[in-house]
Regions:
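Short, glycine/charged-enriched secondary-structure capping and boundary segments
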Residues: 14-16, 55, 155, 167
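ATP-dependent carboxylate activation and anion-phosphoryl transfer catalytic cores
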Residues: 60, 99-202
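Phosphate-binding site of ATP-dependent enzymes
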Residues: 16-108, 129-136
């Protein structure tokens, strides 16, 4: 039971994962009372992974994906709730997804999800993977937090840590993509013979 738009995992706690009707009612009422609505979704038993995606300045239909990262939860925890992210994060560890086929599958679904939503600039996809290896997209975090200090790296930073170009290459690509997107939006309509043209914004 979540905030309807995720919102930095606000009010998401271990108790948000409910297994009884009474628990569902309690959590849903709490979230709706505080935020006006609640998102209720099926809990997927399995691994939790994340994939950073960046817009491709040359071909927006083939965005860049970075090394998928899998979380290792401490005993008693099974998903990334607010305290895991902001309070007890030292107990949470992560590692690159080791299975090459799974890593490619995660990149593929993240790439396609970003394109399907007409993603711009960058975003980070959070995905659960069940025991059969089937990925379930939880959400995409558009313009997610990045460039945190190395001692408190965010999830996007963990993905970039395994890319040769790192944060610098990532930032340069985003700037190039922004300029390319701007150029694509300017469509010349006609010329007046004097070197001037009329343009419209897409």
């Amino acid at each position: 039971v979540k905030h309807p738009s995720s919102y930095a995992s606000i009010d998401l706690s271990r108790a948000s994962r409910v297994q009884t009707l009474a628990g569902l009612r309690r959590q849903a009422n709490k979230i709706m009372r505080r935020h006006g609505a609640a998102l209720i979704e099926e809990y997927i038993e399995g691994a939790e992974c994340t994939v950073l995606v960046a817009e491709n300045p040359i071909d927006p239909l083939t965005p860049t994906t970075y090394q998928p990262i899998q979380y290792r939860f401490p005993p008693g925890e099974s998903f990334k709730h607010s305290n895991m992210k902001w309070v007890d994060y030292d107990a949470l560890s992560s590692f690159p997804v080791e299975d090459p086929q799974l890593a490619e599958n995660l990149r593929d679904v993240s790439r396609r999800f970003f394109v399907a939503l007409n993603g711009a600039s960058f975003g980070r996809c959070d995905i659960r993977v069940d025991s059969t290896g089937e990925p379930y997209m939880l959400e995409i975090n558009p313009n997610c937090g990045v460039c945190y200090p190395a001692s408190d790296a965010g999830s996007a930073d963990l993905c970039l840590a395994h890319d040769p170009a790192g944060h610098v290459g990532f930032t340069r690509q985003l700037v190039a993509a922004a300029f390319a997107r701007h150029r694509r939006r300017r469509l010349p309509l006609s010329g007046d013979g004097a070197g001037h043209s009329v343009e419209k914004l897409r």
